[in-house]
């Protein structure tokens, strides 16, 4: 079905990843949007790895952007991080919890 829908077998182990924000382990927040994308994906992939999962286990990704003009960079960074992996995807324009956060990403993985 491609990225319009992915079926998860009943026996799969599910991981629900809370919204990942652009805060690095040292507490810093990158000033630019691309740096924030990298920080968010670093955080999300670390959560996946902690559950012994990889990007190909992602079945659903929801990205919250603060501006529509961020979509192109967001898509490019996502494709760089995920390669050929194409989970079901939703992108929403919102106001984030903290003004300095330019995006947040949550996900569901199944293995």
Predicted regions and their residues:
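Short, polar/acidic, helix-capping and beta-turn segments at strand->helix junctions
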Residues: 1-111
């Amino acid at each position: 079905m491609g990225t319009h829908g992915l079926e998860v077998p009943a026996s799969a182990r599910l991981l629900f990843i809370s919204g990942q924000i652009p805060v690095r382990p040292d507490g810093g927040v990158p000033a630019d949007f691309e740096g924030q994308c990298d920080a968010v994906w670093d955080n999300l992939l670390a959560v996946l790895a902690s559950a012994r999962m990889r990007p190909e286990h992602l079945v659903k990704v929801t990205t919250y952007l603060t501006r529509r003009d961020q979509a192109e960079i967001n898509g490019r960074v996502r494709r760089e991080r995920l390669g050929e992996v194409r989970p079901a995807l939703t992108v929403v324009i919102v106001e984030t919890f903290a003004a300095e956060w330019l995006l947040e990403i949550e996900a569901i993985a199944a293995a």
